Amino acid sequence: MKLIIYWTKEAMHKPSDGSPRMYDRIVKRFGFSDYISINGETPVDVKEIDLPDLKVAEERGYIQIRNK
């Protein structure tokens, strides 16, 4: 399923404890490209099985899922 992910400030924030940004963790978990457009969006291809986990990240405020 092709989607557009918009990255929020919360995902891009670097924690003070030295742990990776949530952006880095999401990119690694789902195998997304590290490309981000000037508008803060990344085009992605998500497997149906991974969609519920991606929705959890959206509910926590790290991303917005956009259908374009």
Regions found by a protein language model. Give the residues of each.
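Short, mixed-charge low-complexity intrinsically disordered segments
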Residues: V44-K68
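Short, solvent-exposed S/T- and G/P-enriched segments that are highly enriched in secreted/extracellular
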Residues: I38-T42
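N-terminal acidic leader/helix
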Residues: M1-S37
